[in-house]
Amino acid sequence: LHKAIHSFPTRRSSDLETSSIIKIDSLYDGPSVSYIIGDQSVWEGTEYENLVFTRQGDFTIQGGQHTITYVEDPGLAEGQYYLYMFNNNIGISETRPDFDWSALGLTESSAEDGDTSYYYKYLVDENAGTFSLEDSFEVPYSGYVSSAQDLGGNTVIDSGIPGIFAEYDKDHELIAQYTMDTEKFIYRVYKYDFQGFYFQ
């Protein structure tokens, strides 16, 4: 799988090659796939095709996503949670070069020469086996790397390939944006308030 497995109360992994988010049970003791958040057609004909959750609503699936973040909310029912990410909005797979990502609405295939990436926030319902797009907004395009961080109502975005990072308010209006002159890319950007750090 591409990228690290994120340590949540249950384990979820973000897989670039399939543009999927995979929940893994018993990660360190007989791991097994619990369910998949992705497009059904990617998994068609495999042993996992019946594990793909149903997409509710009309939206383009995430493509090449990074920094998936699990969020519990006391206002949600048991078995529901939020999941937000930097949606690179790229359709590419080195292991499946003939797969038609454009049929899913993922028309970008370049790390640099794309139009738009997105912040995506899903509502996942494990009981119903569904996921829906609860929030999204456009951000500068980056086909690879990048990050998203919700912070006190604002959102910090790193579009890693062009070296752009920015903060947006709760209405997705740009507060400030910075561009670094870099030879490669910015892997991640996080903002900290330093409250509760050991040196205070």
Show which residues each predicted segment covers.
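Short, small-residue-biased leader/transition segments that mark boundaries at the very start
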Residues: L1, H6-S13
